[in-house]
Amino acid sequence: DVASLVLAMLAFRLQKVHPNSRYTYGYKKSTILVSLLNAVILLVAVGIIIAESIDKLFHPVSVDGSAIAWTAGVGVVINALTAWLFMKDKDKDLNVKGAYLHMAADALVSVGVVASGIIITYTGWSIIDPIIGLGIAVVIIVSTWGLLHDSLRLSLDGVPVGIDAQKIQQIIMEQPGVENCHHLHIWALSTTETALTAHIVIDNITQLEEVKQHIKEALEEAGIHHAT
């Protein structure tokens, strides 16, 4: 979890580094790479949880339910509070979503451990521990799948979620003076910035700057702040 938060913070810092002759867009895409890495790490963690849970199903181990419940209870509070800090912006930035899911997943695991600890304390059913573990693994997989899908999409320069390429082309075509729009490309510079390039034919070259300004203003309203 600490590594996940450090990676997210590092990506935020790199995103603000100015472009140079070798990296003409700067290091903005580091936020996408980190969100993808966080998704992969979460899935690896799920694999470990599943493997350990299956092993416990076939090789039950007696545990002190009371001790693990109290210990995990502390984890619930810490992880839940940390996840809450990221909750507000998790739908606006994949990098934030990755960090949020890490902390939320840990909070969920801790809740599961507390629940199994209490049940074991009062019933002695040690088998409940791996069963809850498998249930938690399923929940994490479902919640992480969207992060993995969106991160892969942005890594491959796909059109960001929430942006409709056909609608964007229509917006451009509706601007005064525009006759045609082709070779339209839309991709993510980072988890918060979207770029666009297009060949646009206008009916009067003397109005070039005016038409460009209208198009850029319309695109900014549509969530695209870097257009050429």
Which residue ranges define each predicted feature?
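Alpha-helical transmembrane segments and adjacent TM-loop junctions that form the membrane-embedded core
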Residues: 4-228
